[in-house]
């Protein structure tokens, strides 16, 4: 896992660039992708109430960091947020340790 010193940004920073509506859409879409089964044990209300930082914590506590990055890339692409999916893909987005 990359440290924050090695990356100019992390998944939390990317999620914080989303508007409240976009973040809600991200939360909804994350469960629809094939990798979304990793989150099935997390109560929907917990995901719905989470802000960007809390969502990253949920991802990393219920799955591996590779999954979190891949899931984020897929959801950003579904949302037509290609600038975010490209940055995530290019830098292997992970939260700081």
Swiss-Prot record:
InterPro entries in the cross-refs: DAPIN (IPR004020), DEATH-like_dom_sf (IPR011029)
Main localization, broad class: cytoplasm
Cellular compartments annotated: Cytoplasm; Nucleus
Keywords noted in UniProt: Cytoplasm, Immunity, Inflammatory response, Innate immunity, Nucleus, Signal transduction inhibitor
Alphabetical list of SMART domains matching this protein: PYRIN
Function in brief: May play a role in innate immunity by disrupting the interaction between PYCARD and NLRP3, thereby regulating the NLRP3 inflammasome. May also inhibit NF-kappa-B signaling distally by affecting the nuclear accumulation of RELA.
Signal peptide: none
A cellular component term, taken from the record's GO annotations: nucleoplasm
Xref: CDD domains: Pyrin_NALPs
GO biological process, one term: negative regulation of tumor necrosis factor-mediated signaling pathway
Subunit structure: Interacts with PYCARD/ASC (via pyrin domain). Interacts with NLRP2 (via pyrin domain).
Tissue-specific expression: Predominantly expressed in peripheral blood. Weakly expressed in testis.
Cytoplasm listed as a keyword: yes
Domain Pyrin as annotated: residue spans: 1-94
Keyword Cytoplasm: yes
A Pfam match: PYRIN
Protein name listed in UniProt: Pyrin domain-containing protein 2
Disulphide bonds in the chain: none
């Amino acid at each position: 896992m990359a440290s924050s010193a090695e990356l100019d940004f992390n998944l939390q920073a990317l999620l914080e660039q989303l508007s409240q509506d976009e973040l809600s859409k991200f939360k909804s879409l994350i469960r629809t992708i094939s990798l979304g089964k990793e989150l099935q044990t997390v109560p929907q209300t917990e995901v719905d109430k989470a802000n960007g930082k809390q969502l990253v914590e949920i991802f990393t506590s219920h799955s591996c960091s590779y999954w979190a990055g891949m899931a984020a890339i897929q959801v950003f692409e579904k949302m037509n947020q290609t600038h975010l999916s490209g940055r995530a893909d290019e830098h292997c987005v992970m939260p700081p340790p």
